[in-house]
Design a protein with these regions (language model features):
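Conserved catalytic-core segment of nucleotide-activated headgroup transferases in glycan assembly
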Residues: 14-16, 22-23, 120-177
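Donor nucleotide-sugar binding/catalytic pocket of nucleotide-sugar-dependent glycosyltransferases
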Residues: 93-104, 112-126
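Aromatic "clamp/platform" in nucleotide-sugar-dependent glycosyltransferases that forms part
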Residues: 192
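Catalytic binding pocket for nucleotide-activated donors in carbohydrate/polymer assembly enzymes
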Residues: 196-221
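Active-site proximal beta-strand in glycosyltransferases
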Residues: 48-80, 96
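A conserved, positively charged/aromatic
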Residues: 84-93
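Short alpha-helical donor nucleotide-sugar binding micro-motif in glycosyltransferases
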Residues: 179-184
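N-terminal pre-catalytic "stem/leader" segment of glycosyltransferase-like enzymes
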Residues: 1-61
């Protein structure tokens, strides 16, 4: 039994998929699957899970039983209200982050205590992929990379006479992703730094081979 705190205003009025929306969607699906009771934006049960620690999450946090609060994974370490947690570790039970590298960052760069990794679950695809039937060659998945880099990928595929479809982060819905994964031979991943990489893991869950043009640094620092 758990209390969840988040704001649907992050994605209200659109069916486009983003990381924050996917975290909440997959979390709720997991709780339903395991038949775990939960409340949303009220302290009904003993344990508090502040999924989105934005300004609204900070205000909600101040009115909760602090020692029962787990905070994350949607927490931006540069926010002023987040910095207060660095000097007041008694205000939370644990900070959770979606991967080992973000845990190392939270501890070594920002000085947080009691940090745990918690990657959200990835649902199995409802549309089954047939490796013998493809309608096009490649999905280009683009997130936080330059227009020039995207154009370079397009030029490369065109030179090889490969057909493709493009998914740009924030401009597609879940049905788009699932349908393309069921019809493509492979994915060209043109991605920035990821904390967990939910969309990437969803593509992998469809058994789609991924070619990744990697990055070696986090440009937000």
């Amino acid at each position: 039994m758990i209390n969840l705190f988040y704001e649907e205003s992050y994605w209200f009025g659109t069916n486009r998929m983003t990381g924050p929306r996917a975290v909440v969607r997959n979390l709720l699906d997991s709780l339903h699957d395991q038949k775990i009771p939960y409340a949303i934006n009220e302290e009904k049960y003993e344990h508090n899970f502040i999924v989105q620690y934005d300004r609204n999450g900070y205000i909600k946090h101040s009115n909760l039983t602090l020692e029962n609060c787990v905070i994350g994974p949607q927490i931006w370490f540069f926010d002023e209200h987040v910095k207060e947690l660095q000097q007041n570790s008694e205000r939370y039970k644990s900070i959770i982050v979606p991967s080992q590298w973000t845990k190392d960052l939270a501890i070594n760069k920002f000085g947080f205590e009691r940090v745990e990794t918690w990657p959200v679950g990835i649902p199995l695809p409802e549309i089954k992929r047939d490796d013998d039937v493809h309608q096009f060659d490649c999905i280009i998945y683009s997130k936080r990379r330059s227009v020039q880099e995207l154009n370079d990928v397009v030029d490369l595929l065109n030179k090889k006479n490969m057909s493709f479809r493009t998914l740009v982060y924030g401009n597609y819905n879940q049905e788009d992703l699932a349908l393309m994964c069921s019809r493509a031979k492979f994915c060209f991943l043109l991605n920035g730094t990821e904390s967990q990489g939910i969309a990437v893991q969803e593509i992998m869950s469809h058994n789609v081979p991924i070619f990744s043009w990697d990055v070696s640094e986090w440009n937000d620092m």
